[in-house]
Every structure is written in structure tokens, then in C-alpha cells.
């Protein structure tokens, strides 16, 4: 059975387990020992969608429970990865050692994801999972819109809804949904329940430590993000940039040392909407790393030409380079 690989963006990104193994064999200098199918090694800075379902011998019409969690909400570097995982309601996950991904060592997380990817064992047969990696560029593009800013909570909500919809579209009969909350849990639960009335929705804090299916989703998200970030680091051949969080001295030092005074950072891996990055580029009084640029606006003087439409202005003052219009 073939897993589905699509890009959330127009260009299709395709990878599979065999190509992942070949890439690792070819790159002997890589520190990556396991490349999950949810990571697009050839373009790790791009948004990417991945879906793997249960095996054909597992009935899709039986009741399923589904969990949702994310990784990388707070860092200034890399993608935010949302993951859903699902299994039959009567399949017991408790014996496999799932826990909140943040409480597990990285090697343990990778071992568990390897088990899930292996369709020859009972866990791999009964578990389906999907990830959506939202690139740093896409996150920043939404948050830096001139009008109708697309904040992180809305992006998270929409991604969660899209991922769950795709599971239903694949034929899985989801009857229980468990979500680690983003924002107030009550209003978020009501929102999801309205979208998915056929299931019982539970949204709560610390869901990743309360429900094994959310813990499983947490592992899928965390391993995907960690390896995707390392692939990005290797692709631009840069030194260790730490955890990617602004509180990490290695990360902030990397940002300061590697910023271009005009173009920012290479690799599309920095979230330009984060204060740490914005301060280095937009506040010369606080940082000497940037060059202040005066953007000339179009003349808004009214004319008598009522038939010619004004061409929209690209939001070029946004440093990350995404071409959206206002």
C-alpha cells in the first residue's frame, strides 16, 4: 500500500521510505540516521503534507479515535508541524510506551515512529497518521499581512480542521477526537464540534499526557519537526543553531552572526514575524546589523481616470519575500 504525499502548496512534494533510505546512504556526512516519510529532505524549508493510513486488512468502517498535537509553535527557526494520529477504538496503545514527546529522549521518539512506519507489525497496521509542516515563511506571511492578519492560533485551528477532514475523506470512521488545546479549550472544542458533529470532540490542556492517541500524534509532530530542521541546517551548510528558540543563546547568536544587512537570512528557515528576528532587521536603534530602507509609496493623488484599475502593491516591506498583495 502506498502512502499519500502532497504539498499544501501548489507544487507537489513526493518522497517515500525507499528514497529516504537512499538519500541517507548517499550522504555519509549527514548526522541524520532516520528520515521519516513526513520529511521532504530535498526541500526542508517548504510546507509539506504527508498521510499514511492503516493497512488494507484493517476495516476503516469500525469506530476510530483520533488525536491532534503540534510541535514548534514557539521557536523562531523552522516549521510548525501539526500531526493527527488515529487507530481503532478497541486497539490498545498503552503497552507501547507512548507519552508526551517532550518527556521522551529523541532516540526513543524516533524508535516509536519507526514502529509506526513499519506496516508489518500490529502497531503499524492499526495506526494511521498525517502531518502538515507549515514553513517559517508561510507562518510569517500570514502574521505579517498588511490587513486581516492570520495569527498563529487561526493558522493552527485551520490546519487541524484540514487534517481531520482529510482523514474522513480517506474513509476512516472517526468517532472520537482528542486535541491538545490552542487558546481557550471550551471555545476551541465548540468550534471543532461544529465542524465534526459525527464525533465526540474533547479539547483540553495537557491532552498529550492524558490520551495515548494524542501522545502518538505528539511524537509524529516532534520527530518530523526535529529532523526537518536538521535537514534545513545541513542544506545551507551552517553551524549548529541550537534548539531554534529565542531563549537559546546558540540560536540568538546564530541569528546575529548570519543575518544579511539587506536580505536577512538564507534558507527560508527564519520566522520573520518573531520579535527576535524583527528586532535584528527593523530596529536599527537596537541593532546595528540592519540597513534602514525608505520604501517609496505610490502617489495616491486622486485622478479623473475612473476606468483604469490601480495595480496592487506587493507588500515588499516584508522581509521574508512572500509575494502577497493588499
From Swiss-Prot:
GO terms for molecular function: metal ion binding; RNA binding; RNA-DNA hybrid ribonuclease activity. Its cofactor is Mn(2+); Mg(2+). Residues 63-286 form the RNase H type-2 domain. It catalyses: Endonucleolytic cleavage to 5'-phosphomonoester. Transmembrane segments: none annotated. PROSITE patterns: RNASE_H_2. Pfam families: RNase_HII. Its EC number is 3.1.26.4. GO terms for biological process: DNA replication, removal of RNA primer; mismatch repair; mismatch repair involved in maintenance of fidelity involved in DNA-dependent DNA replication; nuclear DNA replication; ribonucleotide excision repair; RNA catabolic process. One of its GO terms (cellular component) is nucleus. Gene3D superfamilies: Ribonuclease H-like superfamily/Ribonuclease H, Ribonuclease hii. Domain 2. Manganese or magnesium. Binds 1 divalent metal ion per monomer in the absence of substrate. May bind a second metal ion after substrate binding. Residues 15-47 have a biased composition (Polar residues). A divalent metal cation binds at residues 69-70, 180. PANTHER family: RIBONUCLEASE H2 SUBUNIT A. Endonuclease that specifically degrades the RNA of RNA-DNA hybrids. Participates in DNA replication. Belongs to the RNase HII family. Eukaryotic subfamily. This is Ribonuclease H2 subunit A. It comes from Schizosaccharomyces pombe (strain 972 / ATCC 24843) (Fission yeast). The lineage of its organism: Eukaryota, Fungi, Dikarya, Ascomycota, Taphrinomycotina.
Amino acid at each position: 500500500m502506498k502512502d499519500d504525499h502532497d504539498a499544501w502548496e501548489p507544487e507537489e512534494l513526493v518522497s517515500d521510505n525507499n528514497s529516504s533510505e537512499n538519500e541517507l546512504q548517499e550522504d555519509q556526512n549527514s548526522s541524520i540516521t532516520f528520515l521519516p516519510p513526513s520529511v521532504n529532505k530535498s526541500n526542508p524549508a517548504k510546507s509539506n503534507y504527508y498521510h499514511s493510513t492503516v493497512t488494507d486488512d484493517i476495516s476503516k468502517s469500525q469506530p476510530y479515535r483520533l488525536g491532534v498535537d503540534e510541535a514548534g509553535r514557539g521557536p523562531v527557526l523552522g516549521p510548525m508541524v501539526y500531526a493527527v494520529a488515529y487507530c481503532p477504538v478497541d486497539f490498545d496503545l498503552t503497552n507501547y510506551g507512548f507519552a508526551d514527546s517532550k518527556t521522551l529522549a529523541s532516540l526513543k521518539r524516533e524508535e516509536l515512529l519507526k514502529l509506526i512506519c513499519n506496516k508489518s507489525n500490529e502497531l503499524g497496521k492499526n495506526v494511521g497518521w498525517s502531518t502538515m509542516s507549515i514553513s517559517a515563511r508561510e507562518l510569517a506571511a500570514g502574521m505579517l499581512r498588511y490587513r486581516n492578519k492570520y495569527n498563529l492560533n487561526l493558522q493552527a485551528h485551520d490546519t487541524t480542521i484540514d487534517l481531520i477532514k482529510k482523514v474522513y475523506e480517506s474513509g476512516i470512521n472517526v468517532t472520537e477526537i482528542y486535541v491538545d488545546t490552542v487558546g481557550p479549550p471550551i471555545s476551541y472544542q465548540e468550534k471543532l464540534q461544529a465542524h465534526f458533529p459525527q464525533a465526540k470532540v474533547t479539547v483540553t490542556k495537557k491532552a498529550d499526557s492524558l490520551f495515548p492517541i494524542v501522545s502518538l500524534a505528539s511524537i509524529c509532530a516532534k520527530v518530523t519537526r526535529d529532523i526537518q530542521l536538521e535537514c534545513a541546517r545541513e542544506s545551507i551548510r551552517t553551524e549548529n543553531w541550537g534548539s531554534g528558540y529565542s531563549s537559546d543563546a546558540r540560536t540568538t547568536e546564530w541569528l546575529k552572526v548570519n543575518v544579511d544587512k539587506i536580505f536577512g537570512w538564507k534558507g527560508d528557515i527564519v520566522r520573520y514575524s518573531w520579535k527576535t528576528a524583527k528586532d535584528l532587521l527593523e530596529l536599527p536603534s537596537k541593532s546595528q546589523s540592519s540597513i534602514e530602507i525608505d520604501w517609496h509609496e505610490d502617489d495616491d493623488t486622486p485622478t479623473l481616470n475612473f476606468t483604469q484599475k490601480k495595480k496592487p502593491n506587493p507588500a515588499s516591506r516584508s522581509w521574508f519575500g512572500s509575494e502577497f498583495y493588499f
